[in-house]
């Protein structure tokens, strides 16, 4: 029996093909990055050992690729000390087949590079006047608000048409929402929660600034919403017939301030440091004194232990008596934040 002779040529050919494959794979493999910085370098590593085709298949405009397949130490030095990876190749050179998502369009910038910019569809907007946003700011129109939402505030919505107001007068809230004036005298449209669970503990009772005991924070918020302006929290627990602040126990580092107008005390935060800013607007307080800012007024109240409220902005001599009467009923609260009013 004659055995076939071993042919080394076949094994060499196999090894040659394997080496060629490894070389091709090594040449194609690189690093995929999520963005190219202004300095031209790749930043935010997405994945290693990817070909350019694999990296750029994500369709993201900012995705970039580097050909060099380097070790982890080099990658670390690039990202920490060098501002990114060199020889950065952007996946997209034009706006062709670029999907920027809703409210955005791809446009070539001055450097002839594709960029996604905010371009909301405003064709169906019927109201052309100013609108008040959920952030309490007035926008010249709804389209301007949509651009602001696209850029930095994804939760921003129109709460009512017209400029943001300090009173619920002439505010028309959409749907079933109700206008509420918060403790900073800003009007907001909120939806009143008309169903509150019954309290399960006596620790849930709260005393409002109106001298009424509420079963829980939910009941206080509900009353605030239905009333249309801030009630505010005086202190935790049921309301008591206190003769002075000595009868009231404040928690959470708060201090009791006595309201001589109604003969009640309320717990207020007194650890606020007033900034040295010349841009602060002076306020006229309930003691008919003018303070450099609302913060300065609160500081004086905490120092004296007597509650002070803002009657109006500006000097006490800079506004008519009619306007004072209109704003006299607005209740000021130091310790009941706006988020507590609006979270239903």
Swiss-Prot record:
Q: Which residues are glycosylated?
A: 124, 288
- Region Disordered, as annotated, extends over 314-344
Q: So which domain of life are we looking at?
A: Eukaryota
Domain TB: where? Answer: 30-103
What would be one Pfam family of this protein? FOLN
GO BP annotations listed: cell differentiation; negative regulation of activin receptor signaling pathway; regulation of BMP signaling pathway
Disulfide feature = 32-55, 42-88, 56-91, 95-106, 100-116, 118-150, 122-143, 132-164, 168-179, 173-189, 192-225, 196-218, 207-239, 245-256, 250-267, 270-302, 274-295, 284-316
Q: Which UniProt keywords apply?
A: Disulfide bond, Glycoprotein, Nucleus, Repeat, Secreted, Signal
Q: Could you tell me which PROSITE patterns the record lists for this protein? A: KAZAL_2 (PS51465), TB (PS51364)
GO function terms (MF aspect): activin binding
What CDD domains is this protein classified in? Answer: KAZAL_FS (cd00104)
Modified how: N-glycosylated.
Task: Show the ranges annotated as biased composition (Acidic residues).
Answer: 321-333
Please provide, in alphabetical order, the Gene Ontology terms of the cellular component aspect for this entry. extracellular region; extracellular space; nucleolus
The segment(s) forming the Follistatin-like domain are 94-117, 167-190, 244-268
Which compartments is it annotated to reside in? Secreted; Nucleus, Nucleolus
User: What function is annotated for this protein?
Assistant: Multifunctional regulatory protein whose primary function is to antagonize members of the transforming growth factor beta (TGF-beta) superfamily including activin, myostatin, GDF11 or bone morphogenetic proteins (BMPs). Mechanistically, binds to these ligands in the extracellular space, blocking their type II receptor-binding site to inhibit downstream signaling. Plays an essential role in muscle fiber formation and growth both by preventing the repressive effects of myostatin and through SMAD3/AKT/mTOR signaling independently of myostatin.
Q: How does it assemble?
A: Interacts with GDF11. Interacts with activin A/INHBA. Interacts with myostatin/MSTN.
The molecule here is called: Follistatin
- GN (gene name): FST
């Amino acid at each position: 029996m004659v055995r076939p002779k071993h042919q080394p040529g076949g094994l060499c050919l196999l090894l040659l093909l394997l080496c060629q494959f490894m070389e091709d794979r090594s040449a194609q493999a690189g690093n995929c990055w999520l963005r190219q910085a202004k300095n031209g370098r790749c930043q935010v590593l997405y994945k290693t050992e990817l070909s350019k085709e694999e990296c750029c298949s994500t369709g993201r405009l900012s995705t970039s690729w580097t050909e060099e397949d380097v070790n982890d130490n080099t990658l670390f030095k690039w990202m920490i000390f060098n501002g990114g990876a060199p020889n950065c190749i952007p996946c997209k050179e034009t706006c062709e087949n670029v999907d920027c998502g809703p409210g955005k369009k791809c446009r070539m910038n001055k450097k002839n590079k594709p960029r996604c910019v905010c371009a909301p569809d405003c064709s169906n907007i019927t109201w052309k006047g100013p609108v008040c946003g959920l952030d309490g700011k007035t926008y010249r129109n709804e389209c301007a608000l949509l651009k602001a939402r696209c850029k930095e505030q994804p939760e921003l919505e129109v709460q009512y048409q017209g400029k943001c107001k300090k009173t619920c007068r002439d505010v028309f809230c959409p749907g079933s929402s109700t206008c509420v004036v918060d403790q900073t005298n800003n009007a907001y449209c909120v939806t009143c929660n008309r169903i509150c669970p019954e309290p399960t503990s006596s620790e849930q009772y709260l005393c409002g600034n109106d001298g009424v005991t509420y079963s829980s924070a939910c009941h206080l918020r509900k009353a605030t919403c239905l009333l249309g302006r801030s009630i505010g929290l005086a202190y935790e627990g049921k309301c008591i017939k206190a003769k002075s602040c000595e009868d009231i126990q404040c928690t959470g580092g708060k201090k009791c301030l006595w309201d001589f107008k109604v003969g009640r005390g309320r717990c207020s935060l007194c650890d606020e440091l007033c900034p040295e800013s010349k841009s602060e607007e002076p306020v006229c307080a309930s003691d008919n004194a003018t303070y450099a800012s609302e913060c300065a007024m609160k500081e004086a109240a905490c120092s004296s232990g007597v509650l002070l409220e803002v009657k109006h902005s500006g000097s006490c001599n800079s506004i008519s008596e009619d306007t004072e009467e209109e704003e006299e009923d607005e209740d000021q609260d130091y310790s009941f934040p706006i988020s507590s009013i609006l979270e239903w």
